[in-house]
Amino acid sequence: MRYSVFLTVVVFLLAVSCQSAASTERVPNLASVQAAAAEVGKEGLLFGKHADRPVPVASITKLMTALVVVESGQDMDEWLTFEKRHVEAAANAWSRIRVGSQLRRRDVLRIALMSSENFAAYTLARTYPGGFDGFVAEMNAKAKALGMLQTRFVDPTGLSTGNVSTAADLVILARAALKHPEIREASTTGYYRAEFRKPRYSLSFGNTNALVHRDSWGVSLSKTGYLTEAGRCLVMVSEMNGTPVITVLLDSLGTRSPMGDAGRIKRWLATGQPGSVAPAAKRYAQEKNSALMAAEAEQSRTTTASSQ
């Protein structure tokens, strides 16, 4: 009798243990093709989804642009002139800012981050002591120094598909950016009215991350990005169950998909439930992942053949 009771208890404990392990091992279902999440105060990742795959990161690039600016020691109150670009702008680089007008560097940084203003990011690079090329070189040097070993930048705006990184590398970048109050404050400004001079005029800008406007999220760092090749992207630090969490989401279909993924991660951390993704977004992620895996396999075959 005692042996029978003992076996019953053992079986019950094993079942509970297996159920608990299964719930903790499950990861959230996401619309994003690549993703990672990490607690701000701890090393390592809470989870990763193709987190080491280098892909175009679009305007997430501007987080590194901001890091170079604030760590350069330049006068943040200096008036910068928006001069005509020395390189041809991409087709989607249209800006409301008038060529020849001026704005203080801290406000140029603000609209580059919160509203992803490309002319602003370009101007920050052009007015760097080493000029545009020196700025891009410093972006890459800083990435290397931080240990972002699969990251490469070719411009400060993110309009080039040559700007590539991984979800894991961008967690590192978020940690570095989070140390600077100027970046935190500028990236999470909800709305801002910039006052230009020469000529004097003003423009209103809004944050491209809808979650910034929700107090319940406690967003302390934010940057969105989009290119056709990169999909919808988001890097964010927000409160999740009382803990500041870095969320990196790369390449999803819809405008709101990254915000939806952030919500799924938040619920997963609270409940262990993986959640569900809309069929169209799920299909996009599966097709994109299959294409990337095929490209990776082809590259591996080419590399192997060339080394023989």
Predicted regions and their residues:
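Bacterial N-terminal signal peptides
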Residues: 6-16
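A detector of low-complexity, intrinsically disordered, Ser/Thr/Gly/Pro/Ala-rich segments
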Residues: 6, 22, 63, 300-302
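Penicillin-recognizing serine hydrolase domain
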Residues: 26-33, 105-106, 130-307
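Active-site-adjacent loops and short helices of periplasmic peptidoglycan-processing enzymes
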Residues: 18-168, 172-181
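Positively charged n-region of N-terminal signal peptides that target proteins for export
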Residues: 1-4
